[in-house]
């Protein structure tokens, strides 16, 4: 297994978080997952024993641990992007679903001839994990990035029309949407 950047830094940050808020379940599960990826499954097993066995995070960690080949673990999106770029077909277009302020898009577009970004640019359409509606808004401002074409609106409204026409094959897809909403029946 390859752990990119600093597992020690991630562990220290999680421990600080838990010293301030010992009941933070996400931090507890993330720290347990970090220990498990490093070879110590005791924290995951304790959480499963304490009633978290069916939690989606614990189930996801267990599934990953059950694989024959462990994935790389990254502690920054930039490290993850560099790994993805090494495997990407850079002569093709890049697609990003969930653009927000465009930081990831700006980083990735430098490696591709064309980029397409999809977002409402209005933030979360509903409350999500304690974040209020409108969090992650760019206040309707669409980034101005050379080589980019942005499609503004909800995926369920914009993707069918966009992909009804021939589009370049993807060399890389970055899916960074926070919500999955089923399309409404029309």
Where are these regions (language model features)?
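Short, small-residue-biased leader/transition segments that mark boundaries at the very start
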Residues: 1-3
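TPR-repeat structural position
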Residues: 6-8, 41
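S-adenosylmethionine/decaboxylated-SAM
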Residues: 16, 65-67, 86-186
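Residue-level recognition of tetratricopeptide repeat
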Residues: 23-24
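Class I SAM-dependent methyltransferase Rossmann-like catalytic core
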Residues: 33-93
């Amino acid at each position: 297994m390859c752990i990119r950047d600093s597992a020690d830094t991630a562990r220290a940050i999680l421990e600080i978080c838990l010293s301030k808020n010992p009941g933070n379940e996400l931090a507890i599960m993330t720290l347990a997952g970090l220990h498990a990826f490093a070879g110590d499954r005791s924290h995951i097993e304790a959480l499963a024993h304490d009633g978290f066995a069916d939690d989606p995070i614990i189930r996801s960690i267990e599934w990953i641990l059950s694989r024959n080949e462990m994935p790389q673990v990254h502690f920054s999106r930039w490290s993850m992007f560099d790994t993805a770029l090494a495997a990407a077909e850079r002569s093709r277009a890049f697609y990003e679903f969930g653009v927000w302020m465009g930081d990831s898009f700006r980083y990735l577009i430098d490696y591709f001839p064309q980029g397409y970004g999809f977002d409402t640019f209005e933030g979360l359409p509903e409350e999500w994990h304690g974040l209020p509606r409108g969090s992650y808004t760019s206040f309707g401002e669409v980034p101005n990035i050379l080589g980019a074409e942005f499609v503004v609106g909800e995926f369920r409204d914009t993707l069918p029309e966009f992909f009804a026409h021939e589009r370049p094959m993807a060399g890389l897809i970055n899916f960074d949407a926070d919500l999955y909403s089923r399309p409404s029946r029309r």
